[in-house]
Amino acid sequence: MADELERVRISAAELRAQASSFNIHGDDVKDLREEGKKQRQRDSKRPDLQLYKPGVGHPNRRMDSVEGAGSDTLIQPDGFGNDPKMSDESPTSPGCSYMPGTGNEDYLNDHSKPETNHKTDGHIGGDKHKLVDENAVKIIERAGTPKSPKQSRKMRKPDRQIYQPGGRRSQGNKEVGASKELDRDRSREEEVDGKSIETPLKCEKEEKRKNRRGKNDRKKQASVETPSANKTENAVENISNKVSNLHLETVESKDRDRQDDTNQIKHSEEGRKIQTGGANRGMGEDKKKERGNGKSRPGKEKGNNQVFDKKEEGEAGGKASEAPHLEGRKQRNFGAKEASRDQNLNHEKQQGNRPKEKGKPSERTDSKRVNAASKRYSQSDIRRPRNRTYSTSSASSGTSMDGLAEAERLKAEGQQFSARTLERATGQREFVRGGQTRSRRRTARTLSSTDSLEENEVWEREGRRSRAAEEAKSSTRKEGGILRVSLDKREEQASRKSTRGRGRGILVLPAHTDLTQTPDPAPPLGGMRGGMGLGRGRGGRGGGTRRLWDPNNPDKKPALVSSQQSQHASQHQALYLQQGGCGPLHFLDTDDETVGSPPVRQGEFFQNQQAAAMAYYKFQNSDNPYCYPVSANSPNTPPRYPYPYQIPYQIPGSNGMYPASAMTSFYGPYGQGGPGYPSPTVSALTPEEAEVQTRGELGKFLRLADSQELQLSNLLSRERLSQEGLERMAQLRAELLTIYERVILTDIEFSDSQNVDQTLWKNVFYQVIERFRQLLKDQNSDTAPQIKTMLMTILEEGAVFFDSLLQKLQSVFQFKLQDYMDCMAIRARPLRKTVKYALISAQRCMICQGDIARYREQASESANYGKARSWYLKAQQIAPKNGRPYNQLALLAVYTKRKLDAVYYYMRSLAASNPILTAKESLMSLFEEAKRKADQVERRLKQDSDGSAHGPKGHTGGRRGEDAARVEIWIRPSEVSGTSRPTGSESGKDSEQDGELGALSASDLNKRFILSFLHAHGKLFTKVGMESFPAVANRVLLEFRALLQHSPSPLGSTRMLQIITINMFTIYNAQIRAKGQGETRSALEEQAISLGLAMFGLLVQRCTELLKETPTEPIPAEELGEFDEMDDEEGMVRVSVFPHDLRELLPSMKVWSDWMLGHPEKWNPPPCSMQGSPDVWQCLADLCNSFSRVYHGEVLLYKADADGEGDEELRVLQLEEDKMLSGFVPLLAAPQDACYTDQGTDAAIAADCKRVTVLKYFLEALCGQEEPLLAFKGGKYISMAAPLTPSINTENKAQEQEDDVIVEESSLSASEGEIDGEMEGDGSEDDIRELRARRHALAHKLAQQQKRRDKIQAVLQTGGQLEIEVRPFYLVPDTNGFIDHLEGLRKLLACGTYILVVPLIVITELDGLAKGQDSREGVGNGAHARQVQDRARAAVMFLEKAFESRDPSIRALTSRGNTLESIAFRSEDTSGQKGNNDDVILSCCLHYCQDKAKDFMPAERNGPVRLRREVVLLTDDRNLRVKALTRNVPVRDIPAFLIWAKVG
């Protein structure tokens, strides 16, 4: 700890100003009396009511103002010895604080002599009479009002205003009188400066004469009430002589002074008397400014006079014997001044932060001068640079510990003082202050005037009791003193041997002195606080140092910082400063205005420069609780533990992290007596304190690890790794592993909050592995084997480390991983907090083990990821709600090209409690790839079908037109029922697939199904291409149905569970997207639920078929037991005889039933089913009927006890599907009840019994819904759900939407006169004008669309080859077809393969022909007309019957594209249409020709343009056929089409 030096705070400008005021204003005695009253009020106050405590932050600890310098020494008991008298009699003055060992003894002796002469000359002049004797002024004021009553006032906190520079600056303008007096006296300051410089010998002679005079003066002044001019002049002469002889005593004189034990108490008593005997005018004025009220308190004088009168009576006998003793020491003290002065200079050089200030020419010009500083701020609010060699904290600051430390030193040294050196110090102070032109004011805050001497003595005794304990801490401190600057360099070497500290500012001490406590849970490692770097001085306004004590928050304790070193020692301690270790602590000043700083003793420096250059972390001396290594070759390095971890390992006694005794677990895992890890001292720490302390140390380790990781990253960033770099990398990795493992095993909760597990993997392994893998790719074949060997070595190290860490986690936190690998997402009993965090850490270790195994396989160029998959699955079993293991499993699936597994695991990682959001992008890429492959498969199938269509074209008439530029490809559809016939572009594909799916092998069908399944879910996930989702979903259902028919099933139970899980996730994801839309299901969610229910319905249907095929057998009555209510007439099906295919389906059905029980709002009311989907509810009713014949009591299942546990003879029955889907968010709401079975039962049969039980419960729940979907009627279960025809409904809805659009467009192109008539009939002229403008805009839009279609048509006609793929489904006959080929149309309608679309204009023409309206020909043609009329009537009757029976294979179409289900009202106004009736019929055909450029444009540049048509125009009219060919509408006559379609 730095040496503490007592400092003198004096304002020479104030003394000179008051001396001048006495000379000019002789009538200001009354003001001086008032000032003296206030000074005595300050002198008798003691703000330090208790010993300094760093954590308390007492507001009255800082008493460092100039005016209070005298009272500062008086009011603190900690700055002196154990004797209360010594504290009470501390000799100070307004200009000189009590400075042990610096020459204050002379000043004490001078004032201890009786004053005999009170008369001086009538003026103030000469070299020695420049200043007013403040003690004389105090004595005059003390005698002024002896009977004044005492007044108590409320004590204010002195620190709040003392440390506020702004407040002090503003105080200088409050007292105008004092400022004017100082301004008038500035002209006399130079004279004072020149005449106040005296040699030490001359000062000593003058002091002898004044000592004899001073005693008589004080005796007479004590009885005089009002001071006279002579007394004032005598006081001026006395104080000027003492100030002129102020000097600094050397260490040698201090050692000799320690022998004077007999005079110590008297000196202190006389100092107390002198201190309270006088005050200067400036101090009183500043006291008014700080108080803020300007009121005098004369009531305090009485108490002060009483106290000091008593002290004077007891001092007379001891003063006479002091003169010879002091006279004999003058020569010794004078001879030692130069050595002490040069020692101070040497310490200032070592500190390196005391630059010279401008404007001080006499700072280093004479060996008799010392550096000093004026007050902080002058009354004119102008800051001046200055050197401050005094301290406000060693002898007068209540907030510092210097006073306490000084008291300990004085007690050990005997507390000897010398009056002669005190007088010299006073003279030197006058010399130093003489050079200042402005005075700096600083106020002091004290206690109330009611404090008595007895109270002071009580405080002194309390302070003595605590000094014995503090004495040991301050054994290394040096004596304080006033620093002197000397130009004589011959004594620099001698002065360095006794370095001195400077006691000023805030003493920075650790909050706890033992290693078991830490003041800061996470102190910073790098750098020093406050900008105190190496070589930076503390001087200058706003210098490098910052306040450690906030003046705006006086109650907040000061911050702790590490010690600062001098510039000369910077090369030894550069490493220490960089690493931020907790070295020796020292003083740091609280204000920014200081210049220069004495050197601070830092303890032992680092001797190893190589260790410093390597930037290893190391604490100093006993501040290092964990000696982290520097280098193996360094002499200061403790033994280093190489990788792997070799520190002794043991299990702590208790599993708690922070026991109240002494952080047992903090050191337990590493061995209490291991090298480099000192055992902690047992202290009564609470768990909270131990936690704070431990986390503070761990925070240091983590910051150390950050710096080392930075070095490791820098090494890895190099282009090439040298051998030295590799060794350094290995060393850094070993140290990082040690640090991270220590943090994890010490405080697992703190480790989890700081993500230490992931940081360990990323910093120590991942970045190194990735760097070596990159080098392995970039390097040539020569160095590749070496790099691969190093990579494999690192991977092996990682495997060993994480395996060891898993074992240590189990040992430290006392648990077994095997007990928790049960895939329980929610446990009945909560885990211990430490075990919970340890399980999370163990899961991360297993994931890291899997990553290492994966890297090893990739490095060895093999694809056997079985070991990595095993680690990931184990990690998933520990904490199934974490999404990370699923993400890693998805990576393995991508590597092995298992797309369904990859999609499943990515969805699991997204549907976890802590999802991996990056899996969404991975899913997008997988779905995009599935879409691309599905398109390729569809294109290949189309090419195959095209080849088959080209083959028999000659026989079937598939080619129409011999022109090579136009090719028609006709594809014959197979027979399907009209009710289930799909529409759209996929109309002709399903029949083809029906024939092909049965011919495919199981593996090929499985691949096609997986591709279609992923394609459909990709549309649901991305919401792209939803217009083709029904067709894709239908294909998925067809392939899934075909796949279920295979035995054995190519899917398996696991793959089936993945399919069901993907369906649940799609619904879950659609629900998330649809949030905020209310309770109604969105269209996306509706489609996802429909697909999931359809696939579940197929599963139920297949399960019911397998149950019906399973043989039954009678069950004995004694075996039935509680199941005797079952109907056993026809026998029952045992669970043990279930076929294998049924066993494979039961897990998936059970999981989906759990989901339905947990989310009833998703399926009730039932959504619209999809095309190709069975009736799900009817299938469930059939399954319920089949389950009524199943006997599931072969294995008895038991519930848990009331306390949640089963019998010891039972075992928990956990299904594999529950383990697999544990932690899946959509299933968390499903009911999960523990189930137990006997020990000797068959687990597989017991599991099937549980599944059947759950399914029966689910079916009963369907019957118990508010609107039941199943009901038991007539001895069996039936479906109560309303029958839906989703395919027709959805088709009609889509058709109606399209029709509405067409109607709107057609109406715009209709008769303009009709629109104009409507506009003229209603509305004003503005409305008519607006409607006309709208009409023209829409007409323009239609014209643009028509123009675009014309361009497309021109491209088709003038381009390359045109291929038209014809898949007939919609047949549009004209009027001649009904007249000439009515029977053929009847056959086409009866086959149900096609839909007969009758234009309304054709029905209108048939009505006209049936009525004979068009028979205008001659008589010769009458027979033909009657024949036409009869055929027309037959056609009308045919159409009316067909529409009345609501045959789905026939429909009517208006000219505007509207579909009619009835022809009861079939009149249509066609007056506004352009063209004839043939054009209207052709427009109906074009309604089904929805061409899209992206569909028919060729993929290649010169490829053929391919159009798809599902409509065929049936006509014999040549003109209409020509028009149809120009619009690319397929056209055939009815007989030819009947032959091609093989109908009839």
From Swiss-Prot:
Organism: Danio rerio
Protein name: Telomerase-binding protein EST1A
GO biological process, one term: nuclear-transcribed mRNA catabolic process, nonsense-mediated decay
Quaternary context: May form homooligomers. Associated component of the telomerase holoenzyme complex.
Domain PINc: 1369-1522
The keyword Chaperone belongs to this UniProt entry's keyword annotation: no
Function: Component of the telomerase ribonucleoprotein (RNP) complex that is essential for the replication of chromosome termini. Required for normal embryonic development.
Cofactors named for this entry: Mn(2+)
Residue numbers spanned by region Disordered: 25-503, 536-573, 936-964, 976-996
Pfam hit, one: EST1
Ranges of biased composition (kind: Low complexity): 389-400, 562-573
Top-rank taxon, per record: Eukaryota
EC number(s) on file: 3.1.-.-
Biased composition (Gly residues): 536-545
Basic and acidic residues compositional bias, start-end: 25-48, 108-141, 177-209, 249-273, 283-330, 338-369, 421-432, 458-495, 547-558, 936-947
Biased composition (Polar residues): 223-244, 976-986
Subcellular location: Nucleus, Nucleolus; Chromosome, Telomere; Cytoplasm, Cytosol
Keywords noted in UniProt: Chromosome, Cytoplasm, Endonuclease, Hydrolase, Nonsense-mediated mRNA decay, Nuclease, Nucleus, Telomere
GO molecular function, one term: endonuclease activity
UniProt free text on domains: The PINc domain confers endonuclease activity and is expected to bind the catalytic metal ion.
Record carries keyword Nucleus: yes
Changes seen on gene knockout: Morpholino knockdown leads to a phenotype ranging in severity from weak to severe that are developmentally delayed with disturbed brain patterning, necrosis in areas of the brain, aberrant eye development, impaired somitogenesis resulting in stacked somites, perturbed yolk sac extension and posterior axis extension with a high mortality rate of 93% at 5 days post-fertilization.
UniProt xrefs under SUPFAM superfamilies: PIN domain-like, TPR-like
